[in-house]
Amino acid sequence: MSFFTTEFVNFKNRCVWSWNGFVHVCKTEASMRQWIIANIISGFFTFVAPISYTEQAILLAAGILILAAECMNTAIERVVDDISHEVRSAAQQAKDAASAAVAITATAAGVTWLVILLGVYL
């Protein structure tokens, strides 16, 4: 196979694997479904709010980053649970840190909304 054919096949495989992972998280994690609904609502408001295209892009990206953080959180939970189901402090700390990453990302998105809206309405 040529270089470009090989790279195309690799790219296609990565897309399929990524999609499969996203679908798995959506099917198994209620919090992911809740974040998707929040992103749909947030996305709607980005297009009706009197804000610039740049601000729209920033807000949409912030929402997408929450979804990425939720995927990473789920991946960490799966690996920790796969290693052992016994209660271990390091395992709990890893899971808590992954959850905190989602919370911090969501807080950053909320602060972004707040700053942009304050700029519009003040």
Residue ranges: model-predicted function:
Residues 94:
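Short basic (Lys/Arg) and small-residue
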Residues 1-78, 83, 87-90, 99-122:
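Hydrophobic alpha-helical transmembrane segments
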